[in-house]
């Protein structure tokens, strides 16, 4: 009967063209075996059943076709929270944690403020804020009901009860809502962007990625309709593309926002721009 080490080494060779061949093979095999990665080294001679091998090889083939690891595993870590993800949701990125950081910087520890997360997807941003500011009232919206189902399941599994979820096309279902902080990681990729044919994004929901010819359609709509939904001195925080900061700042300025600032992500790229309602 085959054992762990040769099966793992064969997968690493299969993944030789991937940047993280060993890591990805280990992650997939430990997922199939429902063990931690360290188990693979502690028990290299552990026996594998035919079913386990078939399951592992099927995942490897899907990965070779470019399917994201997060979708193969069914989960992704964000802000130290393990979140369920499916092809109905965007895969949370590390750079989006900057958006959470900047939101928390504007919410005192004991704050019970109203926070709105527009386009929540898997719920990553809303859940991270709710975890760090448990007294805040968090409302998370998305125009995709299937994504909201995943977000709600994540909230329930994590025991985060003070979050409301609502189907809404941006501001559409929020007529009576005003917030101290509004955050959004909206679609901001141009429809002609060549990256759409590369890597993980090929498998992610297009409506969570693409936003018009220059990638600014959703951001423009969010900004131009935002003031009525913010309390006095309230904050709007937006993630955007590395080359969109100037355009986002200009849109905020036109609406009369103050304290407009852009923050870089860990790679040094302009990633989050914020503005305060006068």
Where are these regions (language model features)?
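Non-catalytic accessory regions of SAM-dependent methyltransferases
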Residues: 1-41, 45-48, 58
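Short helix-capping segments at alpha-helix termini
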Residues: 18-19, 133-135, 156-161, 229, ...
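Residue-level signal for inorganic ion chemistry
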Residues: 28, 66, 96, 125, ...
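Conserved AdoMet
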Residues: 30-106
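Active-site beta-alpha loop architecture of Rossmann-like, nucleotide-cofactor-dependent enzymes
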Residues: 70, 189-192, 243
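Conserved SAM/SAH cofactor-binding pocket of Class I
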Residues: 98-195
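Mobile active-site "lid"/loop adjacent to the S-adenosyl-L-methionine
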Residues: 188-218
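Conserved Class I SAM-dependent methyltransferase catalytic core
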Residues: 213-276
């Amino acid at each position: 009967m085959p054992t762990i080490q040769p099966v793992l080494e064969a997968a690493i060779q299969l993944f030789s063209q991937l940047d993280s061949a060993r890591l990805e093979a280990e992650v997939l095999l430990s997922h199939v075996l429902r063990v931690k990665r360290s188990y693979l080294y502690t028990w290299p001679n552990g026996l594998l059943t035919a079913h386990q091998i078939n399951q592992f090889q099927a995942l490897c083939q899907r990965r070779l076709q470019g399917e994201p690891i997060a979708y193969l595993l069914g989960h992704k870590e964000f802000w130290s929270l393990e979140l369920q993800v499916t092809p109905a949701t965007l895969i949370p990125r590390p750079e989006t944690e900057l958006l959470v950081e900047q939101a928390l910087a504007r919410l005192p520890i004991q704050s019970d403020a109203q926070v709105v997360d527009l386009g929540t997807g898997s719920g990553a941003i809303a859940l991270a804020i709710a975890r760090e500011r448990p007294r805040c009232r968090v409302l998370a919206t998305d125009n995709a009901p299937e994504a909201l189902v995943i977000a709600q399941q994540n909230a329930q599994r994590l025991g985060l009860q003070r979050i409301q979820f609502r189907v809404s096309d941006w501001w559409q279902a929020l007529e009576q809502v005003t917030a101290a902080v509004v955050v959004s990681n909206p679609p901001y990729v141009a429809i002609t962007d060549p990256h759409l044919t590369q890597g993980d994004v090929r498998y992610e929901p297009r409506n969570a990625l693409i936003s018009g010819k220059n990638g600014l359609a959703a951001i423009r709509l969010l900004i131009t309709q935002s003031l009525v939904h913010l309390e006095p001195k309230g904050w709007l925080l937006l993630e955007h593309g590395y080359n969109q900061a100037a355009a986002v700042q200009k849109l905020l300025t036109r609406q009369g926002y103050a304290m407009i600032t852009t923050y870089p992500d860990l790679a040094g790229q302009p990633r989050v721009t914020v503005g305060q309602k006068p």
